[in-house]
Every structure is written in structure tokens, then in C-alpha cells.
């Protein structure tokens, strides 16, 4: 019934198994991949014919984590998986980026890849396995895919590169780098690092590329016995149309791309495009020689070639800069004075308004992942409204691109954040991209660094980011610093590097062609370092470090520690005690399992009142000390006084006053404020208090003549 095939190799000290032929047999390609005991199922379906009118490749990648994979049941009312989590979105992008450039040029058939985590051993992250499984499924599917692709994670632990570290090992690593590519070339890099140098980062990329070669060999071995017949597909040849178009508008298009202002340039390009459409419009009653989609597609190709030729031939770019010059930068802080911290970072025609907000433990984000629940205290949200590029468009929840760009900036900043002990605040940063012409994610990095320092967050060092590009034709190439949007779309590489003056904290690379050598990557990294140092210098005109004090409107947090066996006393039955403290003092209180108590308020008096209240609950009263208390109950034999937080004690009728007392109510009534001295505890542990030894007017102990005391005791 099943035509099963299986390949197994040892990879990174664990078995990697690729299986096909048993599950999801109606998909064009399906592979069940196992690494350690983590399993993912990758499926590929590509329609037999393209939809008419498409001028792009409709590829969709859906990565999904099923909670049953880790033996869990989803939370929420419906108890089933819902919208994609942030990690699912990020891994979907991670899979998409290295495979997209490898589909044949001109292939526009609707293609969907679904990757499902069906088992998680809580040791091996399924993201790398998902790249491998997808590559294998595509290689078997028969679609025109120029793979296979391999992928690997690289850590840097105790001064050595580690291939595919376990999840718990990553806590010790100074590097979290994912690299993917073919047997000959690197296509994608995604990383977070703790201020590592350029040479070390490049070494990690090459180590990872070498590390996944056995995976590519295993996929080829599986394809030799299980691959479907390749589909008949011939890339359309539009060279004749391109030649005609070049004759008609070649010079005009070249001149349009010499206009430095973005809006004026776009208007000139649109005018050229309109001329092209008019030139190829059929006469009345005639069939068109080319479809509008073909004309549009070839015009895009011609745009790319014109820009690329100009750069390679002249060394001059669209906006007139040379290859290494960074656009003019203006950095401002405190632009929104009532917020906790704010910055406006402008680089050429790219601008980010970034706002930092300080919160308490209550504001931490709870994340329920397959590996368990954890709390995130640093949040970074990137928004890209359509007005930033002079367009109208959809507004609403963030798309994949916005989530991905926000995470890239988050990775760049996180290594420089203070520890929770040093700065016990939850941090939320929002980057509003108000203008965009390339490199908005790196503007977010710069703006975030400034906004956090403006808020008084003690970053270890300021962080800046720069986006690099590449134009390569044959042996000729040009590496571009601080790329524009057009240079990103029409170039061969998008290489984003963020870091401090001392090293790299985040690196992301996407390459659209094969043949990017180690030499080119080294040039790009070195050029990016120069650009980063320049940007840090420009940012320093606004701020060089964190402000010494928090903003006027930011909450203050003080931390105290209590014994863990006292936590229940502070919280009270059903939260009664802590609610009362919050209501009466106005402070916010967060208690950790280890006894750490964080008290937050913008009012110092509220914090002090809450601290004092909690202290009285957890501290033990000392014998011989005098306390102020409140009479809570009277009886024939004395009065009960609440004198130390929730603690009550008895003042016996004989201890109410120095003279003989007939009735308790003659001396005190419920609600009276009194001073009491803790005399000790009886044999049952009950508190013994005295009022008569304390001056009720001053709260001071009454000093009596020792000889008189002796005579009184004898009597």
C-alpha cells in the first residue's frame, strides 16, 4: 500500500531521518523529518497551471506548531490552535527566504508549503528541521526548484562554534545564528549576537554552510529513489520584447533613475511606463502582440538592468551618492515630552518615530510556547503604515513583514539591555515608520536605542544598524552602503547589520543569486562596520548614553525581598491582603515565586507606604519594642490591639493603666489609637502587650524608679 523511502544520517551528534511515501501522499511532495525526537511534516502543493494575469510568484509558506506535539492542550475557551503565533510567523519567513530565489524564473504557479510540528522533544528546535524538510519535499515534488537547500544553527560556546546546539545549551551561547543555502552558496542568514566581531560572524556563517553539506547529500540521495518526474516548464523568453522596449525608452528610463528625489523619480518612471504601454498598445481591431502582464514584467526587468548598469559603470547610485556614503542623518530625542522616552530618527527619506514606555511586572507578556510558558519583559512593535510611502492601503493587525522587521530590531537591541535586577521594568517600544525609502528596520534600531536612553534605560552601549546591498554581474560587483528601497528591490542582496562600536548584535542576510563568495561577504561586513560607526557618531549628537533620571511621567519601581514562606501572608486568602494594600496605597505590586517584590508608582510616598505595609506583614515584632496600634476589640479581661500589620495582641486589664481599672471600657474603646510595648509571649505563643509602661501622649516608655518598682513588687 505504501511506497516508502527513508534516508538516515548522523548530524551534529544526533540522527536525522527523512521519510516519504507514507503520509500526505496526495501532495506533490511530502517529507516527515526527524531530528533527535523532534518531528515535522512538510508538504508541497503547486497548481498545474498559473492563474491568468499574475505578474509575481504566489508562494505561501505556513509553519504551524501543534500543542499535541509537546503533550499539551491549547488554552482559551475553544481549546484549539488559533491564529499564528509570533514564532510561527517568524519561522514561516525563515523557511520562505532561502527557497524563494531558487524557483525557476517565470514560474508563477500558485504554490503552498505547509510545515507542521507533530512532535517536539523539547531539546531540538524544529525551525532548522523545518527548513530541511521543506527543501526535501520541494526536491521530491517535481516543481522547477533549483535546490536542494540545507540549513543549520550555529552557537558560540566557550570560544568554539557549535553546530545545532540543544535548546538549553543556547542559554550559554554568545551567538544564535541560522544559515541556509545550497551546496555552493549561502542564501540566508538570521542571527543575534553578544557584540561579536566581523571575522567571528563570517566564520560562523561559513562553519554553518559547511555543517549542512551532509544534509544536502541526504536529500539528493532520497530524491534519487523517490523524486517525481520534473514538470515540463520552460522559462518564457522575452528578449525580443526587451530589445524593442530598450530602443523606445532606454535613455528616458536611465535619465529617470538619475533623479535623486524619490517622488519625482517615481513620477518620471511612471511617465516612461505609460509611454511603453502606449507604444505596445494594439491598433483598433488587432490582437495585442504582448499581454499587459508580459509588458509589465519585462519593464520591471529593464528597470533593474538600467539601475544596475548605472551603478556598475559609473559607481554612482540613484540618489547621486557613491557606494559607501550614508544618507544625511538627523537624530532627535524627547520629541513627545509626556511619554516616557521618544526619538525621531531620520536618514534621508526614511524616518522612524520611536516611543519607549516603562511598565511593571503586570505588563510582561506571557508567551505559551511548546517548550513551556515564559514571560517577556522587552517588547518591540514595528508599524509600517501605507502613508509612509505615499500610498493608501490596509490598516489593522501587523503583517508578516512588520512582525519580522520588529523582531530583527528586537534582536539587535536585546543584548545591550540591563538585567532585571539592575532595571526591573517591563519595556515596550513602538516604532512608527513615518517615511520609508529603504532600511526602515535599521532606522528602528537606531530610534529604539535613542528612545530607550531618553527614557533613562541604562543600555550597555548605543546600538545602530545599516542595510547593505549588492549589484553583481559576472565577475563585476558593487557593495552598497545604506541602500534605498529601489536598490533593495533591484539588487542581489539585502544585508542588514546592527551593533555597537565594539561588535555585532544582529545580522540578517538575504541573497537572491548564487555565487556570493566569502570575499564579497567580508567586504560587505567591513563596509557595514564603517557605516555603523558613522551612524553611531551622528546619533551621539542627540544622546551618548542613558539619562541619569527617569522621565517625569514614568513609573518608579522599588524592589524588596521577602521570605518565600511569607508570600501567602502578603497575598492573603483569595488575594484579599494584597488587594487592600494596592487599593489603600495606590501602588502596583508584583510578587515573584522567589520572594522578589516589585512595587511601582509614579508617587514616591505610595511606594514607601506599600513597602512599610509589606514589611509589617513579613517582619516579626521584637520583645521590648514599642508599637502604635488600634484597639480592635474590648472584653472584660482586657483589650485586643492590632499593632504590627495583621498581628493582634492582648493588653490584659491589669496592663491598661497604672491605677486599678474596673472596666476595660473605662480606659479604651474600639478604634482608639494606643501605644503598646511588646512584653513577650505566653506559654501558648500568645502576644502579651502593655499600655501602662508607655506614655500614651508621647509613645515613650515610662522610666520608673527601680527602688519603687522593687517595693511595689514586694507588696
From Swiss-Prot:
InterPro entries: ExoRNase_PH_dom1, ExoRNase_PH_dom2, ExoRNase_PH_dom2_sf, KH_dom, KH_dom_type_1, KH_dom_type_1_sf, NA-bd_OB-fold, PNPase. Residues 555-614 form the KH domain. Its cofactor is Mg(2+). It comes from the Bacteria. Residues 624-692 form the S1 motif domain. Its main location: cytoplasm. Mg(2+) binds at residues 488, 494. It is found in: Cytoplasm. One of its GO terms (biological process) is mRNA catabolic process. NCBIfam families: polynuc_phos, PRK11824.1. Belongs to the polyribonucleotide nucleotidyltransferase family. This is Polyribonucleotide nucleotidyltransferase. The gene is pnp.
Amino acid at each position: 500500500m505504501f511506497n516508502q523511502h527513508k534516508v538516515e544520517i548522523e548530524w551534529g551528534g544526533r540522527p536525522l531521518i527523512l521519510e516519504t511515501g507514507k503520509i500526505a501522499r496526495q501532495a506533490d511532495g511530502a517529507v516527515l523529518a526527524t531530528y533527535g525526537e523532534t518531528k515535522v511534516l512538510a508538504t508541497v502543493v503547486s497548481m498545474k497551471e498559473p492563474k491568468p494575469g499574475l505578474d509575481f510568484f504566489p508562494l505561501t509558506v505556513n509553519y504551524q506548531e501543534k500543542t499535541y506535539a509537546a503533550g499539551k492542550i491549547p488554552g482559551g475557551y475553544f481549546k484549539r490552535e488559533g491564529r499564528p503565533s509570533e514564532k510561527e510567523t517568524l519561522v514561516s519567513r525563515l523557511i520562505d527566504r532561502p527557497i524563494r530565489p531558487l524557483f525557476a524564473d517565470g514560474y508563477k504557479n500558485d504554490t503552498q508549503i505547509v510545515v507542521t510540528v507533530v512532535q517536539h522533544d523539547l531539546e531540538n528546535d524544529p525551525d532548522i528541521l523545518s527548513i530541511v524538510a521543506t527543501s526535501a519535499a520541494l526536491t521530491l515534488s517535481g516543481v522547477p526548484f533549483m535546490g536542494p537547500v540545507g540549513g543549520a544553527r550555529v552557537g558560540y560556546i566557550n570560544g568554539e562554534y557549535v553546530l545545532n546546539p540543544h535548546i538549553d545549551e543556547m542559554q550559554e551561547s554568545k551567538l544564535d545564528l541560522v544559515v541556509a543555502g545550497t551546496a555552493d552558496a549561502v542564501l540566508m542568514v538570521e542571527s543575534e549576537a553578544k557584540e561579536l566581531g566581523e571575522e567571528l560572524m563570517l566564520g560562523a556563517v561559513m562553519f554553518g554552510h559547511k555543517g549542512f553539506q551532509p544534509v544536502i547529500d541526504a536529500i539528493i540521495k532520497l530524491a534519487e529513489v523517490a523524486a517525481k518526474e520534473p514538470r515540463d516548464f520552460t522559462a518564457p523568453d522575452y528578449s525580443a520584447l526587451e530589445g524593442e522596449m530598450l530602443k523606445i525608452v532606454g535613455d528616458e528610463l536611465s535619465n529617470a533613475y538619475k533623479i535623486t528625489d524619490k517622488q519625482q523619480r517615481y513620477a518620471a518612471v511612471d511617465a516612461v511606463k505609460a509611454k511603453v504601454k502606449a507604444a505596445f498598445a494594439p491598433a483598433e481591431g488587432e490582437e495585442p502582440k504582448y499581454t499587459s502582464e508580459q509588458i509589465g514584467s519585462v519593464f520591471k526587468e529593464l528597470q533593474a538592468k538600467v539601475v544596475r548598469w548605472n551603478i556598475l559603470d559609473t559607481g554612482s547610485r540613484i540618489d547621486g551618492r557613491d557606494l559607501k556614503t550614508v544618507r544625511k542623518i538627523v537624530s532627535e530625542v524627547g520629541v513627545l515630552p509626556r511619554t516616557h522616552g521618544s526619538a525621531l530618527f531620520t536618514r534621508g527619506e526614511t524616518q522612524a518615530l520611536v516611543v519607549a514606555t516603562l511598565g511593571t511586572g503586570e505588563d510582561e507578556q506571557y508567551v505559551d510556547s511548546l517548550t513551556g510558558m515564559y514571560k517577556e519583559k522587552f517588547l518591540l512593535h514595528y508599524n509600517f503604515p501605507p502613508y509612509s510611502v505615499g500610498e493608501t492601503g490596509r490598516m489593522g493587525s501587523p503583517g508578516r513583514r512588520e512582525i519580522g522587521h520588529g523582531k530583527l530590531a528586537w534582536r539587535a537591541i536585546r543584548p545591550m539591555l540591563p538585567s532585571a535586577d539592575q532595571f526591573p521594568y517591563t519595556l515596550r517600544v513602538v516604532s512608527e515608520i513615518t517615511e520609508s525609502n529603504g532600511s526602515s528596520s535599521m532606522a528602528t534600531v537606531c530610534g529604539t536605542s535613542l528612545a530607550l536612553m531618553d527614557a533613562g534605560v541604562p543600555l550597555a552601549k548605543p546600538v545602530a544598524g545599516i542595510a547593505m546591498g549588492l549589484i553583481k554581474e559576472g565577475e563585476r560587483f558593487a557593495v552598497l552602503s545604506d541602500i534605498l528601497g529601489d536598490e533593495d528591490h533591484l539588487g542581489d542582496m539585502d544585508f542588514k547589520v546592527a551593533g555597537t562600536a565594539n561588535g555585532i548584535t544582529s545580522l540578517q542576510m538575504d541573497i537572491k543569486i548564487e555565487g556570493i563568495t566569502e570575499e564579497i561577504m567580508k567586504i560587505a561586513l567591513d563596509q557595514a562596520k564603517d557605516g555603523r560607526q558613522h551612524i553611531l557618531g551622528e546619533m551621539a549628537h542627540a544622546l551618548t548614553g542613558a539619562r541619569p533620571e527617569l522621565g517625569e511621567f514614568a513609573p518608579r519601581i522599588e524592589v524588596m525581598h521577602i521570605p518565600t514562606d511569607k508570600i501567602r501572608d502578603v497575598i492573603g486568602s483569595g488575594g484579599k491582603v494584597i488587594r487592600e494594600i494596592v487599593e489603600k496605597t495606590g501602588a502596583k505590586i508584583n510578587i515573584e515565586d522567589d520572594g522578589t517584590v516589585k512595587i511601582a508608582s509614579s508617587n514616591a510616598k505610595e511606594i514607601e507606604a506599600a513597602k512599610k505595609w509589606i514589611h509589617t506583614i513579613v517582619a516579626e515584632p521584637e520583645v521590648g519594642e514599642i508599637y502604635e496600634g488600634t484597639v480592635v476589640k474590648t472584653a472584660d479581661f482586657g483589650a485586643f490591639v492590632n499593632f504590627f500589620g495583621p498581628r493582634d495582641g492582648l493588653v490584659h486589664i491589669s496592663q491598661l493603666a497604672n491605677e486599678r481599672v474596673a472596666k476595660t471600657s473605662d480606659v479604651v474603646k474600639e478604634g482608639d489609637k494606643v501605644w503598646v510595648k511588646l512584653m513577650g509571649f505566653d506559654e501558648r505563643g500568645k502576644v502579651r502587650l502593655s499600655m501602662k509602661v508607655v506614655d500614651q501622649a508621647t509613645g515613650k516608655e515610662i522610666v520608673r524608679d527601680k527602688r519603687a518598682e522593687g517595693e511595689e513588687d514586694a507588696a
